[in-house]
Amino acid sequence: MEEIGHHFGLGATAHGQHHSQLPWGSSPLSAVISPPPQQQQQHQQQSAGYLAHSPLSLNTAPPGVSHGGGSGCSNPVLQLANGSLLEACAKAAKEPSSSSYAADVEAIKAKIISHPHYSSLLAAYLDCQKVGAPPEVSARLTAVAQDLELRQRTALGGLGTATEPELDQFMEAYHEMLVKYREELTRPLQEAMEFLRRVETQLNSLSISGRSLRNILSTGSSEEDQEGSGGETELPEIDAHGVDQELKHHLLKKYSGYLSSLKQELSKKKKKGKLPKEARQQLLSWWEMHYKWPYPSESQKVALAESTGLDLKQINNWFINQRKRHWKPTDEMQFVMMDAYHPPNAAFYMDGHFVNDSGLYRFG
């Protein structure tokens, strides 16, 4: 009986009590999907003799087995296993050397394969295997199952499909068990997916209202490119596309101040570096022309700022640093600078000019 239980996923104790097993490697389907031997005429004759002399009945039980012993008897599959469908195989198991044992087992396999519900039973088994599998694996399983079923049915084309209520009930019960098993396997995955959706919803509620986290991540890079362009501090243009336009208005209204301050900081960092080459060249030219007195007036500073594209602060800082590093006033220049701070001599100091004994003198 243990060998028969191995083929049908059922184990038997020494006292005749059965318990359910579900190892898919040794399940009835794993035995069914293996190609049957080529001795089909012998199987058909033995199957016909088996049906004629051993009518199937769900209400009969093998000797020594009570329906009330053990909690496993409430399982419909176990109740079917206790019937005379497997009783003949159990009797044959007493003589392992007999050739009728293997023939009866193969005959039962052939009946299951040729049964009208075999397709749904095989599909239910594959559904259990597909739980959590990648799409490409599921597609391969389906293709292999279809090809295998076609070859098996072709090999058993001569076997008739007689009506057997007990076998029908067995197929339906096993199919129902596989469906329930698939539901148990699928439930944890469904709970995990529901948890992920709930977390995503919470993250979306914490972020911008009405905008999904995926949209924020997808559009974040383009907005950063616009901010890092280094041009004018104007806000990016808004495309008129319904809901997206409202979301962009909301974003600009909420973060415009932050973006403006960020752009100003970026522009300051750029200005702290070296001045453009052309601007430095113009400042050096003015420096060489006015080396004796490198103090540009306010109007000259404005003109230099316009021609170089710099601001007045940059112009002042450049001349201060240039004078500290590369200019040393002569004695006459020091005298002029000292007299410029005394009121009696203030009349002699003008914009880039001063008057000495020989008359009006201009530096540069």
Swiss-Prot record:
Region feature (Disordered): 13-49
InterPro entries: ELK_dom (IPR005539), HD (IPR001356), Homeobox_CS (IPR017970), Homeodomain-like_sf (IPR009057), KN_HD (IPR008422), KNOX1 (IPR005540), KNOX2 (IPR005541), TALE_homeobox (IPR050224)
Subcellular location: Nucleus
Compositional bias segments (type: Polar residues): 19-29
Tissue: The unit of inflorescence is the spikelet, which bears a fertile tract, the lemma, and the floret consisting of palea, two lodicules, three stamens and the pistil. The lemma is completed by the awn, an appendage homologous to the laminae of normal leaves. Expressed in the inflorescences and lemmas and at lower levels, in palea and vascular bundles.
A Pfam family assignment: KNOX1
Occurrences of domain ELK (ranges): 246-266
CDD domains, alphabetized: homeodomain (cd00086)
Record GO terms (molecular function): DNA binding; DNA-binding transcription factor activity, RNA polymerase II-specific
UniProt keyword list: DNA-binding, Homeobox, Nucleus
Primary location: nucleus
GO cellular component: nucleus
Record-annotated DNA-binding residue ranges: 267-330
Quaternary structure (record): Binds DNA as a monomer.
Similarity annotation: Belongs to the TALE/KNOX homeobox family.
Protein name as it appears in the record: Homeobox protein KNOX3
Taxonomic source organism: Hordeum vulgare (Barley)
Lineage of the organism: Eukaryota, Viridiplantae, Streptophyta, Embryophyta, Tracheophyta
Name of the encoding gene: KNOX3
